[in-house]
């Protein structure tokens, strides 16, 4: 007996559109029933009945015109093709164990060791488990998600325009789906302070959920990409290394690292498999998630060149060649377009498209190029190893990580390809 195919059946475009709309209406129905509806731009759902009636009408018409394959079979085929069983089996134990371990250790550290003396960090609750994700720059991302970007020309201190919008936008969308829009809507059924705390806690929980889900999705694509270069055992080892190296702590934080990881892996994987639309979406997300996201255009250009060179002797029609080339180029420039979009927005807000870059000086950060790598070397030669690492432990750790990454560029390039080596070189 042959196993069922995991490849989604080829269907007319109207059937795929109807099935997609049906699934979305089903999700909206469930959301409205559980969380009271949602409002996005021109879409407003306040009760589950309207999307439910629309779902039933579209499903009935679709199956009347095309009974086979039914909707549930198409959805199952798509899920099996997108997230194969081997990828799930390899990924979920590593993801769950490492992410929960980081959160558990963090919580135990807070309740057993305590917080530093002085003013406690910003808190949303008396429960330290709820406050745990609220560290470092998380408050800035939540501020953008809840209140949007704000800029004051007379303020010389820190302002939220220094942070890119991808992560706050996704967080805001998820928080609204989880009912945040209804918490502060009058008339309030609880004291304003309690309502505001609940509102903020929904956003904080949504931010952490975005990070954890993004990391999970990124690890699934990471495993599939790794399997194209190595066997299953080595791919599983790569998953473990990715999720447990020292800086992987940020994959369990309400930070941009997880979303950026997902966007980069998604862009790499889909461009390599010639899925131009999906690759473009992931590449654009990378461009609006972190300041270095636009650098992804370099490695994507290498992949695009490889595709074009590989398909030069082809029997395809000129029209198909042109469309294929346009798709490749479009996906390649999306990270740059994301940077331009954010810079254009900042220009409309401040009159300077690079004001977001200048805002980093309030944190004492500035771009100094390769000289950043030379400063630790100079300090090391002057002070000696023990004195330098004792005086600057964080800088020493960062310098060691940078040197290790630089030493791996050539082996990675030789083993996996120039696109990966270039990605490392651009992001050290």
Residue locations for each model-derived region?
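Start-transfer (signal-anchor) and selected internal transmembrane alpha helices
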Residues: 1-23, 55-121, 323-334
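Membrane-interface helix-loop-helix junctions at transmembrane boundaries of multi-pass membrane enzymes
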Residues: 9, 311-330, 407-425
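Transmembrane-helix motifs of polytopic, lipid-linked glycan transferases
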Residues: 171-175, 206-229, 404-411
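Transmembrane-helix signature of polytopic, membrane-embedded enzymes
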Residues: 182-205, 217-244, 262, 419-422
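Multi-pass, polyprenyl lipid-linked donor-dependent membrane glycosyltransferases
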Residues: 210-214, 223, 229-271, 286-298
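Hydrophobic, aromatic-rich transmembrane alpha-helices
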Residues: 382-418, 424-428
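Short hydrophobic/aromatic helix or loop-helix immediately within or flanking a transmembrane segment
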Residues: 132-150, 154-199, 372-378
């Amino acid at each position: 007996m042959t196993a069922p195919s995991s490849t989604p059946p080829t269907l007319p475009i109207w059937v795929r559109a109807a099935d997609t709309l049906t699934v979305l209406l089903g999700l909206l129905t469930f959301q409205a029933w559980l969380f009271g509806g949602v409002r996005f731009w021109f879409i407003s759902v306040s009760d589950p009945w309207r999307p439910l009636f629309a779902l039933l009408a579209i499903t009935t018409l679709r199956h009347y015109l095309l009974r086979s394959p039914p909707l549930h079979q198409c959805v199952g085929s798509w899920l099996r093709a997108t997230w194969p069983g081997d990828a799930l089996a390899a990924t979920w134990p590593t993801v769950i164990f490492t992410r929960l371990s980081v959160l558990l250790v963090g919580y135990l550290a807070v309740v057993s060791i305590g917080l530093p003396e002085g003013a406690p960090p910003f808190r949303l609750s008396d429960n330290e488990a709820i406050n745990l994700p609220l560290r470092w720059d998380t408050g800035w991302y939540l501020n953008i998600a809840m209140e949007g970007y704000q800029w004051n020309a007379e303020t010389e201190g820190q302002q939220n325009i220094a942070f890119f919008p991808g992560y706050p936008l996704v967080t805001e969308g998820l928080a609204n789906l989880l009912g945040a829009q209804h918490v502060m809507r009058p008339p309030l059924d609880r004291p304003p302070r309690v309502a505001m705390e609940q509102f903020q806690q929904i956003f904080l929980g949504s931010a952490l959920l975005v990070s954890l889900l993004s990391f999970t999705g990124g690890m699934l694509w990471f495993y599939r990409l790794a399997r194209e270069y190595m066997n299953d055992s080595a791919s599983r080892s790569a998953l473990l290394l990715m999720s447990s190296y020292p800086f992987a702590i940020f994959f369990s934080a309400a930070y941009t690292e997880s979303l950026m990881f997902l966007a980069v892996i998604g862009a790499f994987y889909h461009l390599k498999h010639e899925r131009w639309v999906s690759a473009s979406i992931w590449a654009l997300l990378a461009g609006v998630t972190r300041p270095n996201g636009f650098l992804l255009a370099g490695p994507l250009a290498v992949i695009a060149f490889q595709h074009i060179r590989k398909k030069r002797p082809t029997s395809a029609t000129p029209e198909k060649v042109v469309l294929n080339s346009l798709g490749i180029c479009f996906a390649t420039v999306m990270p740059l377009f994301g940077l331009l979009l954010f810079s254009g927005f900042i220009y409309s807000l401040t009159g300077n498209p690079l004001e977001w870059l200048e805002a980093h000086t309030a944190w004492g950060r500035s771009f100094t190029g390769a000289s950043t790598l030379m400063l630790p070397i100079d300090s090391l030669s002057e002070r000696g190893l023990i004195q330098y690492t004792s005086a600057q432990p964080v800088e020493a750790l960062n310098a060691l990580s940078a040197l290790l990454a630089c030493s791996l560029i050539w082996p990675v390039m030789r083993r996996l390809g120039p696109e990966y080596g270039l990605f490392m070189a651009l992001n050290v």
